[in-house]
């Protein structure tokens, strides 16, 4: 026999699965810059390899970070555009780390090279995420740049070689699902 009363009791006063916790604030994925060295066909941002008016300066970014900390935001993912095109990216990351944020860098990976890998490692990002959209041909087609896959992969390998926690991000579409 099915007794609804026991189910109603459980719904009205459920058995806790663990101790009650106050969740931390939200994860903030912050598009610090619109400029990008790529023109990916699937990107939501209308980007180009040029500066755009109206972007926040370093001091303004720092003020926003103060506000985010006051709102108990625990995680900042620095994104764009391509955040490595921002001259103050390492200053921003350094301040965020000093403030106690978990700091991630979201990059297309093509600009991670010998000229900046030491600065990336020194910035002590908690995570560097590099987007790949498939294997070589598919990725380069999405990115509209021949050689983008090889450059991104080289950036991933440089990070790994210096002990930077790095990972691949893959957005599956009908055009690249077979590459997964």
How would you describe each model-predicted region?
Residues 56, 87, 147, 175-178:
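Residue-level signal for the nucleotide or nucleotide-sugar donor/cofactor binding architecture
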Residues 60-64, 92, 116, 148-158, ...:
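A general structural detector for well-ordered alpha-helical segments in enzyme core domains, enriched
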Residues 86-87, 92, 99-102, 106-108, ...:
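Short acidic, glycine/proline-enriched helix-loop-strand junctions
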Residues 83-85, 109-114, 129-145, 174-175:
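Conserved radical SAM core fold
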Residues 2-127:
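Conserved alpha-helical substructure of the radical SAM core
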Residues 102, 155-179:
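Conserved strand-turn element in the central/C-terminal portion of the radical SAM core barrel
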């Amino acid at each position: 026999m099915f007794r609804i009363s026991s189910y109603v009791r459980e719904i009205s006063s459920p058995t806790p699965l663990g101790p009650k916790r106050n969740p931390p604030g939200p994860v903030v994925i912050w598009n610090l810059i619109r400029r990008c060295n790529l023109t990916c066909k699937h990107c939501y941002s209308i980007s180009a390899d040029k500066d755009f008016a109206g972007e926040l300066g370093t001091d303004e970014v720092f003020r926003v970070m103060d506000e985010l900390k006051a709102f108990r935001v625990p995680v900042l993912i620095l994104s764009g555009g391509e955040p490595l095109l921002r001259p103050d990216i390492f200053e921003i990351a350094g301040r965020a780390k000093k403030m106690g944020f978990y700091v991630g860098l979201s990059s297309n990976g093509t600009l991670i090279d010998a000229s900046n890998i030491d600065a990336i490692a020194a910035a002590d990002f908690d995570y560097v995420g590099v987007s790949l959209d498939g294997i070589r041909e598919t990725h380069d087609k999405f990115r509209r740049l021949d050689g983008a896959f090889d450059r991104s992969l080289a950036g991933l390998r440089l990070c790994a070689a210096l002990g930077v926690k790095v990972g691949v991000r893959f957005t599956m579409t009908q055009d690249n699902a077979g590459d997964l």
